[in-house]
């Protein structure tokens, strides 16, 4: 994740080349071309979405959105889906930057969940949680991760999906709009 080299996209010499390199390296290693993109440090330029769409990327996780995916049109007219991403439920932000204890992260996640779970009876919601094994997986923190997921996954209708699964569900529910090229001025 986060590109081939972890550096802001606006500082690379050739953004299109970096994206293509990432896609090629991942496909060569896994045998499968990635469908999604999570860029370095949530950075983008005005051209990033266009380059990603050209490379066949179907969804991004770079935008700090609320709790529902959205279609975003590129200048080519192709739609890319922006999946929710959340800084409030991000272990680096909560524990390493804000210096909260692990139980605060759990409590925050459960409060967030209870709110969107109640709202989800009208429309589906996505609860994005960003976790890093070296941080949340530490022996003094892992029990809070378990408690969080045990509670969340015990509720009817809740699933734990990756980006591709969320994308497939979303496209089934809300197909991409017809491609429209933007008008040049």
Regions inferred by a protein language model and the residue ranges of each:
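Metal-dependent polysaccharide deacetylase catalytic core of the NodB/CE4 family, i.e.
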Residues: 1-45, 76-78, 84-97, 128, ...
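Aromatic-anchored helix/helix-loop segment that forms the rim or "lid"
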Residues: 90-122
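Alpha-helical scaffolding within the catalytic cores
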Residues: 63-82, 107-116
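C-terminal domain-boundary segment and adjacent tail
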Residues: 59, 110-185
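Alpha-helical scaffolding segments of alpha/beta enzyme cores, especially the outer helices
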Residues: 17, 21-28, 47-54, 111, ...
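His/Asp/Glu-enriched short active-site or ligand-binding loop at hydrolase and phosphoryl-transfer sites
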Residues: 4, 53-71, 84-93, 161
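Short, solvent-exposed turn/loop segments enriched in Gly/Ser/Thr/Pro and often Arg
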Residues: 37-44, 63-67, 164-165
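Non-membrane alpha-helical structural segments and their capping/turn regions in soluble enzymes
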Residues: 12-20, 99-110, 139-142, 146
């Amino acid at each position: 994740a986060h590109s081939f080299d972890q550096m802001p996209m606006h500082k690379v010499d050739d953004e299109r080349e970096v994206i293509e390199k990432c896609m090629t390296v991942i496909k060569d290693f896994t045998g499968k071309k990635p469908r999604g993109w999570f860029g370095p440090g949530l950075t983008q330029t005005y051209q990033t979405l266009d380059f990603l769409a050209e490379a066949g990327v179907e969804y991004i996780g770079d935008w700090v959105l609320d709790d529902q995916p959205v279609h975003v049109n590129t200048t080519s007219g192709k739609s890319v889906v922006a999946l929710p991403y959340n800084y409030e439920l991000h272990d680096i932000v909560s524990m390493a930057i804000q210096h909260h204890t692990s139980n605060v992260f759990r409590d925050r996640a459960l409060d967030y969940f209870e709110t969107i779970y109640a709202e989800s009876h009208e429309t589906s919601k996505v609860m994005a949680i960003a976790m890093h094994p070296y941080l949340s997986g530490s022996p003094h923190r892992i029990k809070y991760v378990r408690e969080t997921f045990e509670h969340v996954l015990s509720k009817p209708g809740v699933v734990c999906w990756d980006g591709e699964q969320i994308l497939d569900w979303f496209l089934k529910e809300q197909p991409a709009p017809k491609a429209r090229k933007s008008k040049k001025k």
